[in-house]
Amino acid sequence: SDVYALKKEDELISIAVILHIDRKTLELKNIVTKENYRNKGYAKTLLKSLCGNYKQKYDRMLVGTTENNIPFYVKQGFDKYEKTIKNFFIDNYKEEIKDGELTCTDLIYYSKDLKKK
């Protein structure tokens, strides 16, 4: 795995974790931005940089997300639906996982073609 951080004047703003699946595929395992910096484009900037860095060696990047975050990833080019793992968050976590006000249940995978312009 690779871990990336976006800082602003020595303050950690966003962090991302990339898992190498095979010789041509990566998975964005997590990307998170500090609460007081959200909705200001930091995650978008970090993700764009990661895609740019990896496109020379890899063909596609996967992301598993919740329904609430799909619009963000589609705007970033993750436009191909791959699969849904039903009840992922219920089956794999003892405590309820929330995304804002929504309770997370399914893990939904999308992919981005890193070679596409």
What would you call each of these model-derived segments?
Residues 1-3, 103-110:
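Short hydrophobic/aromatic beta-strand or adjacent loop that forms the aromatic wall/cage
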Residues 5, 11-20, 25-32:
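Conserved beta-strand in the GNAT
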Residues 7-9, 112-113:
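Active-site beta-strand termini and strand-to-loop segments that position acidic
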Residues 37-49:
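Conserved acetyl-CoA pyrophosphate-binding loop and the N-cap/start of the following alpha-helix
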Residues 54-67:
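Conserved GNAT acetyl-CoA-binding A-motif
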Residues 67-92:
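Conserved active-site alpha-helix within GNAT-family acetyltransferase domains
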Residues 91-99:
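Low-complexity, intrinsically disordered Gly/Pro/Thr-rich segments
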